Amino acid sequence: YVPLEGDIGLISDGAGTGMLTLDLIRDMGGEAADFCEMGGLTSPEVMYDAMKEVFSGKPGIKSLLVVLIGGFNRMDEMAEGIVRYLREHPVSIPLVVRLCGTMEEEGKTIMKEAGLPVYDDLRTAVADAVRFAAGGE
């Protein structure tokens, strides 16, 4: 976890994915509040802890962007961690989640059943996170 100056929280499951997403956030007029990269094999607990780290790390986050592209990591487990965190710690900011990879459909189902949006396209996800942070609906 590295705190930054902006207002868009960012969680990614790899350094490359995170760096690309940081660039896209800036290219679209936003500023990231952090760089939280989970790296390596993850689990629902690791995802939960990443959410906890971001929300306890810096005040003033206006949207949270979670970008997960899993080969080894299972998207259903990542979704379980996100949903569990939000059930235990409701947040009032928009959440933007992009899931792609192993067990993707199962992960999307878990998110949708919890009433949480899931994005198929990284650029659309980033654009919405930037728009939400700027106060857009």
Q: What positions do the PLM features span?
A:
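C-terminal hydrophobic structural anchor segments
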Residues: 60-101
